[in-house]
């Protein structure tokens, strides 16, 4: 078994799927660690090509020898809620001013998408988490 690489840093960024460029935020996040930014952009874009149009969080593990690995997550719940409700952004005063509405089916669909990344055992618990996020954005659920 080869010796384990020592981890130098863990960087988390949210990027448009299939559209990462060496410009900020990628360059500013990876530059100080001496990682080949173009190499990361190519690998990330290739892996997220099928999810274009979504914001995809990525966790980049940078090792001491300047190599890296990355894990893509599911899109943020807030992004999925905005897309489902057809909104540009959430409410500025969420508990007073409601800006949209989601059906139970839409909430279930979002929860299904987010389930691998959520700390929930079943779809019902995941739906409650998504409903809470929607509430804090000023979106009502039936």
Curated annotation (Swiss-Prot):
GO cellular component: cytosolic large ribosomal subunit
One GO MF term attached to the UniProt entry: structural constituent of ribosome
Keyword GTP-binding appears in the UniProt entry: no
Family: Belongs to the universal ribosomal protein uL11 family.
Provenance organism: Nocardioides sp. (strain ATCC BAA-499 / JS614)
SUPFAM superfamilies: Ribosomal L11/L12e N-terminal domain, Ribosomal protein L11, C-terminal domain
Complex and partners: Part of the ribosomal stalk of the 50S ribosomal subunit. Interacts with L10 and the large rRNA to form the base of the stalk. L10 forms an elongated spine to which L12 dimers bind in a sequential fashion forming a multimeric L10(L12)X complex.
Protein name, UniProt field: Large ribosomal subunit protein uL11
SMART domains per the UniProt record, alphabetical: RL11
């Amino acid at each position: 078994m080869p010796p384990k690489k020592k981890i130098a840093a863990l960087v988390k960024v949210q990027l448009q799927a299939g559209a990462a460029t060496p410009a900020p935020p990628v360059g500013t996040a990876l530059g100080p660690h001496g990682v080949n930014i173009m190499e990361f952009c190519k690998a990330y874009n290739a892996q997220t090509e099928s999810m274009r149009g979504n914001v995809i969080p990525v966790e980049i593990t940078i090792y001491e020898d300047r190599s890296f690995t990355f894990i893509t997550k599911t899109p943020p719940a807030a992004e999925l809620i905005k897309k489902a409700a057809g909104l540009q952004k959430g409410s500025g005063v969420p508990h007073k001013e409601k800006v949209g509405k989601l059906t139970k089916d839409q909430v279930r669909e979002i929860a299904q998408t987010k389930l691998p990344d959520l700390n929930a055992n079943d779809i019902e618990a995941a739906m409650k988490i998504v409903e809470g996020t929607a509430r804090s954005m000023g979106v009502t659920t039936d």
